[in-house]
């Protein structure tokens, strides 16, 4: 029923300010998840099991981080048929993010520009929300650094968050690719990334001993990388035995949206315009990584065929964000069914 009603709901939501609509949707999904209403109204999504990073996924179509930064609507999103849920990005301390307005729709391009800036309630509240959720499927927890933490001390924030979220995560995503936190993408540089992953891997081993379980780490990277940068990142992932990589985050490019309203707004562009760039990075990663490190493909998925294209490029799993906002819950089932057909 959600699927059939969504076009009407979207028409109303798209008349609202984009961020206000986002918060309203989160509140509604949070309430629906708590009451069980979401399950009653949700589309039937077939199982299409996958095992990736040593984890068992009900199906290979997940929710990308960013839609639920505080983990406040996990049960509501889970009821929509996603095979896994990723929430965050969370930082050690609560922060407001960048000034509003900071979220813009580009409906002519099926795109969104955001410069949210890791707005979140902090890792302590985040963990409380995660613990309160009833969902027991695969849950990814996405971590970042506070805006006022010097880039030279970024590892401290990631290590702190990793320790706090580790007991509650199926996997942990290291987000170093948001364009909306000053200098964050510097951490994708060879030396910076090597040092960060070495520290995180050491922390992961110690936490695994403490908690009696190894929680996989996944690195989320940008689409705005040249071939040499992708090769360096792949080599660093292999060197440190990182369990997964998510490709990709939003792009700074505006080539595909030139002349459209809001196209010149600062921030990361997501949606259809990032589809090809994301697929190109996935193909390059697969060529460098082989089967050693699984790839989660995200960026511009608006149909089942788009999801299949991500897998054909080399992804093992996919995630939805902007396509989900434009298409609604029906997109989840469509993608799962298309992938299951092979």
From Swiss-Prot:
Pfam families assigned to the protein according to its UniProt record, in alphabetical order: DHO_dh
Disulfide bonds listed in the record: none
CC cofactor note: Binds 1 FMN per subunit.
Enzyme type, top EC level: oxidoreductase
Gene3D superfamilies documented for this protein: Aldolase class I (3.20.20.70)
Cross-referenced HAMAP family: DHO_dh_type2 (MF_00225)
Protein name from the UniProt record: Dihydroorotate dehydrogenase (quinone)
The gene coding this protein: pyrD
């Amino acid at each position: 029923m959600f699927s059939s009603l969504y076009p009407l709901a979207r028409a109303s939501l798209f008349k609202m300010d984009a961020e206000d609509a986002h918060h309203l949707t989160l509140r509604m999904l949070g309430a629906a998840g708590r009451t069980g209403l979401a399950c009653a109204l949700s589309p039937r999504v077939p199982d299409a099991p996958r095992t990736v990073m040593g984890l068992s996924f009900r199906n290979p179509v997940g929710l990308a981080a960013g839609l639920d930064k505080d983990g406040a609507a996990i049960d509501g999103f889970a009821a929509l048929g996603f095979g896994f849920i990723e929430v965050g990005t969370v930082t050690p301390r609560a922060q407001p993010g960048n000034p509003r307005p900071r979220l813009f729709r580009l409906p002519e391009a099926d795109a969104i520009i955001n410069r949210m800036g890791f707005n979140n309630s902090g890792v302590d509240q985040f963990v409380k929300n995660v613990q309160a959720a009833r969902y027991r499927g695969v849950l990814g927890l996405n971590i970042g650094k506070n805006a006022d933490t010097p880039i030279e001390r970024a590892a401290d924030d990631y290590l702190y968050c990793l320790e706090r979220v580790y007991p509650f995560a199926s996997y942990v995503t290291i987000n170093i690719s948001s364009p909306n936190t000053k200098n964050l993408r510097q951490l994708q540089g060879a030396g910076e990334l090597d040092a960060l992953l070495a520290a995180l891997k050491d922390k992961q081993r110690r936490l695994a001993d403490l908690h009696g379980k190894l929680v996989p780490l996944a690195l989320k990277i940008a689409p705005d990388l040249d071939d040499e940068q992708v090769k360096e990142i792949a080599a660093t992932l292999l060197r440190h035995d990182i369990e997964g990589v998510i490709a990709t985050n939003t792009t700074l490019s505006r080539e595909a949206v030139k002349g459209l309203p809001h196209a010149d707004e600062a921030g990361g562009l997501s949606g259809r315009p990032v589809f090809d760039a994301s697929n190109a990075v996935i193909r390059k990663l697969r060529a460098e990584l082989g089967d050693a490190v699984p790839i989660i493909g995200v960026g511009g998925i608006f149909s089942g065929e788009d999801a299949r294209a991500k897998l054909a490029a080399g992804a093992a799993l996919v995630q939805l964000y902007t396509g989900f906002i434009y298409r609604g819950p029906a997109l989840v089932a469509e993608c799962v069914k298309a992938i299951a057909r092979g």
